[in-house]
Amino acid sequence: MQRTFAARYPASDPLDLGEGTVVVLPSLSFPTAELRKIVGIGYYEERLLFLLLLLRRPAVKIVYLTSMPVEEAVVDYYLSFLPDPAGARSRLHMLAAGDPAPRSLTAKLLDRPELLDRVRELCDGPGGAFVQPFNVTAREQALAERLG
């Protein structure tokens, strides 16, 4: 995914794409001991939900990754700002690892090859795909490489 990104979006805002899939990775890759200290760590993964507004473009799809499912009412709130919330919902894929443990989402995903396979399937289509991480460490790079 990342290999062709720069060539496809050389002079524009990378989030102003006309078509394609954005894989949202709101992972905090810090040591587990540090993550345990953060009150409400589970909600930190929701801080990139503003990216759902990219669905205003009909040819954009989003795969949003989380440790645990995000409340539907929260997702609906963001989609309500779009001209076609139902159309946007059909192009939004919320995937949860189902793991509330205080460790990085990226680590959880790397431990779940079946979930990575599902992300890969969802990224197949026109316009290609790219990963939009919260922060980048060697783990996020490894995840992007495993996704292709």
Q: Which sequence ranges carry the predicted segments?
A:
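ATP-binding N-terminal substructure of ATP-dependent carboxylate-amine bond-forming enzymes
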Residues: M1-G148
